[in-house]
Amino acid sequence: MEKLFAVCTPGLEPFAAQELSQLGLMDCDPSARLKIFSTESGASYESVDYEPGGIEFQGSLHDAYRANLYLRTASRVLVRLGQFYAAEFPELRRKTSRLPWENYLAPERSIALRVTCQTSRLYHETAVAERVAGAIGDRLGKPPAVHKYQEDLGADLPQLIVVRLVDNLCTISIDSSGALLHRRGYRLATAKAPLRETLASAMVMASGWNKISPLLDPFCGSGTIPVEAALMAGRVPAGYCRRFAFMDWPHFDSTFWDALLADAGKAIVSEIPKIIGSDRDAGAIRAAQANAERAGVAGSIEFSGRAISAIDPPSGPGWVVTNPPYGKRVSQTKDLRNLYAQFGNVMRAKCRGWHVTMICDRVQLIRNTGLDFDQGIPTMNGGLKVRLVRSLVKTPLTS
């Protein structure tokens, strides 16, 4: 068994834990990891404490394959190669050279090193990286080519190795994912301020959508939320159409991987509930349609160009999951306040009894909707601190 670590955006740890539990990779009850209470009684979220930025779990390398294929809310899956104390450079190099690098690196494979040092005697990150690279060369008999890690290199990404030194305790991990897991392979067309697929999936999960009732995104942009919802409802794995770093490892089990993909393909369903995406930006709608086409779900989503005031929800109740404009996306604060007030008015007029989930960077804007949102979950989007919040649009009492 290996120690594995699912990296995720801070705030999304409970969702990653829930997914791992559903995959049988964590021996826990998902409801104990993320408890979402009814908004009618004052919604709140409770989660156990996690290491910020990820979930550690145990499994085989085959389990690492599965995690990469299925996880929707994680950014990477790391394999822990070793953990040891090192207070001197010779000690660091000696102990690093004992790790089984030959299982993960072909002799010609280039590497990239990501090093962080905190409260340790070895504090110079560049020097630590040099010793680790040297130790890999000691083990393999040939020093690896070391390159800078750049996500936009695509298939030419070097093998990423992550080194952390905290209080002289060194943890060395190797990345099994390659490109970040939010890169599903379908979003080539983008609109302004695109939403990462991992956060979009977390929003759909947090909403409590039952995958039976309709789902609407009235600020859909390039379509990430509708596409992720369609993939989720259709049981299409998040990584079904992409490559991973582990495919280049010397002992990659292609037979197991092919069987895993075949089983995943058999589980895909074509009949999914009504999903609607709308946006006033015609260019965004064109991008959304192109992305849905590449994801193979264009026939399952209805996109239309219309302002929030003109939305036409299907008979419900259903779910609204959306990422309205905020932060740097709109320069005029007054315009934002008016937009959020209008959003709330439209929800009360057209979506009574519907569940609403959204993210926003300012509590005051959330209040401007006039909807009874919960306190939500703090997380990040595009470098901004945001809150993922939920509400239920109440139906007026009849006398």
Map each language-model feature to its residues:
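C-terminal edge-of-domain segments
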Residues: 161-173, 389
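C-terminal catalytic and target-recognition region of SAM-dependent MTase-like enzymes
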Residues: 304-310, 314-399
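A short, flexible beta-alpha/helix-coil linker loop
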Residues: 118-120, 179-180, 325-329
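SAM-dependent Rossmann-like transferase core, predominantly class I methyltransferases
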Residues: 172-206
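Non-catalytic nucleic-acid substrate-recognition regions in nucleic-acid-modifying enzymes
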Residues: 1-159, 399
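Conserved S-adenosyl-L-methionine
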Residues: 195-313, 329, 333-335
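Residue-level signal for inorganic ion chemistry
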Residues: 20, 113, 163, 323, ...
